[in-house]
């Protein structure tokens, strides 16, 4: 069961990391008024954003296959957040697609609104859904989790663009990324402090444990170190440290969940897993597919690893 618990959280982490910078690009898109810069932003993630959404499908599929009771409770208890997240993804996806259908300024403005709003609300609602998963109905921790995912998405989006665009634009994006980093780290500290003070979801003891404290300290170190790298213009290194932040966030979620898998009801991983026969069947069928998907993503990001030149990728 623990292997599948790790696989489910791995898929969630891959989605938060990869589609997270797409969301960040969408939010930073709102800061651009020059049409050429906007086209550059769209070109930055255009080849990969459809593929990145595979991971949210993988997360849902794995959760349903291995822990169907958790899947049903998570959606039943949070159906409005889940529905809002899906609607936000639709808006985020339709905006760039419809933008090119008509050469009309008003049309482009409306499609840009759809793209930007979807890019903001998708991580916000996904973060709130994760907060409800962890802390139940505690309002402030849930809201802070959503805002934290928005902030870290801006960090990864800014770092991704800075690593792939011209120096002049990269220096502007650096300011947004550093500001979002400080907001994210501050938000994490406030969130965990709130959990300790209110014992939201019964997670106070877990938050005060040594492993969780170590992950939080590492996140602060990585975030501040990334900001220093950004100020020095080492954008590739900044991107690596920025992508480490949502990775560490996912590890933190896993640590706060385990050994339960649905804290609001106290459901344990070993209690929620399907029967051994079904689990073995899912393992035999599922893990080769997961390895194939990982190989495909390695190939995809290798092809589009170069800088953006104009409205496309260079070599």
Predicted regions and their residues:
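Hydrophobic alpha-helical transmembrane segments in multi-pass integral membrane proteins
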Residues: 121-135, 186-198, 248-265
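Extramembrane terminal tails and long inter-domain/linker segments of multi-pass membrane proteins
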Residues: 28-29, 33-41, 45-46, 267-270, ...
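Hydrophobic alpha-helical transmembrane segments
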Residues: 144-150, 278-293
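Short, membrane-exposed interhelical loops at transmembrane-helix boundaries
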Residues: 262-281
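Membrane-interface helix-loop-helix junctions at boundaries between adjacent transmembrane segments
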Residues: 72-83, 91-149
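Membrane-interfacial helix termini and the short, flexible loops that connect transmembrane helices
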Residues: 29-38, 66-72, 93-112, 163-173, ...
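N-terminal signal-anchor module of multipass membrane proteins
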Residues: 1-51, 57-60
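Transmembrane helix-loop-helix
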Residues: 72-98, 179-182, 186-244
